[in-house]
Amino acid sequence: MTAREGRAPLVRRVAVYGAVGLAAIAGVAIWSGAASHRGADTARLSADAAARDGASAASPPPALPASAGLPAPLAGSSAPRLPLDAGGHLAKSRAVRDFFDYCLSARSDLSATALDALVVRGIAAQLDGTIAQPEALDVWHRYRAYLDALAKLPDAGAVDKSDLGALQLALDQRVSIAYRTLGDWSQPFFGAEQWRQRYDLARLKIAQDRTLTEAQKAERLAALAQQMPADERAARQKADRQQAAIDQIAQLQKSGATPDAMRAQLTQTLGPDAAARVAQMQQDDASWQSRYADYAAQRAQIDAAGLSPQDRDAQIASLRQRMFTKPGEAVRAASLDRGAAAAR
């Protein structure tokens, strides 16, 4: 694999860093499937959610640490914290769903039984012997029932995005299934998401209404926007600013801007602190590419040495550990190696 093949575009990594809220407000996102689980990114999102929703709650025990015993999709990561309320019960928070979604990101590598065991271990690692432990297990079984019910829908609930009637039906079905399976957990798990989906669908209906003039559409869209809660409006405005910054970073990269030039330009839109972090990410990215290129060259020499598969793999693993010493780097390199091997 070349260094270029091992490259994760900086703009994509900045998007994860700077736009935590984008995935949650990106439009009518439910139509593409039952659940989209995002591995390490989900872990970062859930850490933010846990910090937000548990700010006034009792501090939960430390999360399950990264472990070599984790499934490959979770290697090098840590489970999000399960939040507790002041009485020690499981807090009704979106952060609980984030914990389960973190575990579900490994389900392609696990049987249903193994996935259940992973969740049980993760819950026990944080809540063993507490009143919140059986509560978390109960919510997990409810969430699994929700996902199983979605999977039984025709085409797993996927619909034609151009059919507004089908979109409305799909949303209604999901709301009904969530309430039936999750009960009073449906609101913390999906309430904000469902509100955004209804709002986006209402916008689509106005935009596609051929009986309205452009002026009437603008008036109705403005009236609809006034119904948006203040925190949601602020989140959308923030997302718009973040997307503009991400687009700017992509353009600067495309034009071949130097780190200093990029930092100077981004300071005007993001402020000096954020611009400095982006510049540092760019430097880190360049360092990674250089080290990965050196590693790939040495790995190729090992591949060409005619060793037994066991000796070859052992030498490559040792090389990774020597060259990638920061947390997660060796895992990232191994993942790229597997991708290169699969592509050959």
Swiss-Prot record:
GO biological process, one term: lipid catabolic process
Listed GO MF terms: unfolded protein binding
Entry keyword set: Cell inner membrane, Cell membrane, Chaperone, Lipid degradation, Lipid metabolism, Membrane, Transmembrane, Transmembrane helix
Compartments where located: Cell inner membrane
Bilayer-spanning residue ranges: 14-34
Lipid bilayer topology: Single-pass membrane protein
Functional description taken from the UniProt entry: May be involved in the folding of the extracellular lipase during its passage through the periplasm.
Protein name: Lipase chaperone
Gene of this entry: lifO
